[in-house]
Amino acid sequence: MGVKLRDVVSPRRIRLEDLRGRTVAVDAANTLYQFLSSIRQRDGTPLMDSRGRVTSHLSGILYRTAAVMEREIRVIYVFDGRSHHLKGETVSRRADIRKKSEVEWKRALEEGDIDRAKKYAVRSSRMSSEILESSKRLLELLGIPYVQAPGEGEAQASYMVKMGDAWAVASQDYDCLLFGAPRVVRNLTLSGKLEDPEIIELESTLRELSISHTQLVDMALLVGTDFNEGVKGIGARRGLKLIREKGDIFKVIRDLEADIGGDPQVLRRIFLEPEVSEDYEIRWRKPDVEGVIEFLCTEHGFSEDRVRAALKKFEGASSTQKSLEDWF
C-alpha cells in the first residue's frame, strides 16, 4: 500500500510519448499484484492453465510489457528480497485482508452476485514463490533484465535511478520518494488502466513543500508507513504542517508526547540508508521466441498466435532504434 502522500504531493500528467527512449525500473511486486488483481475472468477468477496454476501475471508480463516496449520505453523489473522485520505487522495485516476477501468472494459467487465477487476477488490476490519464479523465467526468455534486491525492491529501484541506470521508477506507491528516487512514474500502461501516466519529481516536490528529503521522511513517519503505524489523527497535511513548524520528527514527538510506533532513528535509516545492491547487470537481449512459445503455449496453454503477435512487438521495438546495440 505504501505511505499516503497524495494530499500534499502533486504529480504532473505526461504522455506515454514523453517516456520514449527512457528506461524505467519497474517495482515488480507492485506491478505483479496489479496483474494478479486486474487480469481476471468476469467472476473474479484469475487466469489459470489446465493444471490450475495461476497465469494472470504471465499474461501481464507478456502483453503489457510488449505494449510499453513497442513505444520504445525500456523496462527493468526489480524484485523484493527479504522483508524488513519491522514490516511484519503490515504483511500480517495484508494477509488477513486477503483471507477475509477470499471468503467474501466465494460467498458472493455462491449468491450469484458477480459484481461483488469481482470486487472481493481483486482484494484476495496473493503472491507465491511459484508466481515469482515463473515471472523471472518469462523475463529471462523475453530478454528483459531483472534485478534481485537484497531488501526492498523500491529502495533498489530508487538507487538505480539515482545511479543513472534508469530514468525513473515505475510504481503506484509514493514510498520511492522516501527512498530518494529522483523521479517516479505512476499509471504506466503496465497497470492496464486507460490513464495518462503521472510523474513526480523529488527535487521539485521538496521545493514546493519547502522541506528537505529527511523532513519528507519524517512527515511520512508521522503519517504511518509500511514499517510503523504513525500517529493517529495525523494525515499528510497535518504532518507537513508539524514538520515545517518543529523542524524534525524528534521535536514533534517530544512536544505532542506522541508515539509513532517505533524508534524514529531506526525508521529513518530504513529510508535514508536502505540496503541495496551495487552488483547488478542490466542487459537487454533478443527474445528466445521458441523458448517463450514452449513456456507459455506448451506448458501453460496460451494461444500461440497471440503470443507470436506480442513477440513481434518486442522485435519491432528493437528495429526502431538506431542500432541493435542500443537495445541488446
From Swiss-Prot:
SUPFAM superfamilies: 5' to 3' exonuclease, C-terminal subdomain, PIN domain-like. Its cofactor is Mg(2+). Residues 1-98 are annotated as: N-domain. Belongs to the XPG/RAD2 endonuclease family. FEN1 subfamily. Residues 320-328 are annotated as: Interaction with PCNA. It is an enzyme of class 3 (hydrolase). The lineage of its organism: Archaea, Methanobacteriati, Methanobacteriota, Methanomada group, Methanobacteria. Residues 116-247 are annotated as: I-domain. It comes from the Archaea. Its EC number is 3.1.-.-. Structure-specific nuclease with 5'-flap endonuclease and 5'-3' exonuclease activities involved in DNA replication and repair. During DNA replication, cleaves the 5'-overhanging flap structure that is generated by displacement synthesis when DNA polymerase encounters the 5'-end of a downstream Okazaki fragment. Binds the unpaired 3'-DNA end and kinks the DNA to facilitate 5' cleavage specificity. Cleaves one nucleotide into the double-stranded DNA from the junction in flap DNA, leaving a nick for ligation. Also involved in the base excision repair (BER) pathway. It comes from Methanothermobacter thermautotrophicus (strain ATCC 29096 / DSM 1053 / JCM 10044 / NBRC 100330 / Delta H). Interacts with PCNA. PCNA stimulates the nuclease activity without altering cleavage specificity. CDD domains: H3TH_FEN1-Arc, PIN_FEN1. GO terms for molecular function: 5'-3' exonuclease activity; 5'-flap endonuclease activity; DNA binding; magnesium ion binding. Binds 2 magnesium ions per subunit. They probably participate in the reaction catalyzed by the enzyme. May bind an additional third magnesium ion after substrate binding. This is Flap endonuclease 1. Gene3D superfamilies: 5' to 3' exonuclease, C-terminal subdomain (1.10.150.20), 5'-nuclease (3.40.50.1010). Mg(2+) 1 binds at residues 27, 80, 152, 154. InterPro entries: 5-3_exonuclease_C_sf, Flap_endonuc, Flap_endonuc_arc, HhH2, PIN-like_dom_sf, XPG-I_dom, XPG/Rad2, XPG_CS. Mg(2+) 2 binds at residues 173, 175, 226. GO terms for biological process: DNA repair; DNA replication, removal of RNA primer. Keywords: DNA damage, DNA repair, DNA replication, Endonuclease, Exonuclease, Hydrolase, Magnesium, Metal-binding, Nuclease. The keyword Membrane does not apply.
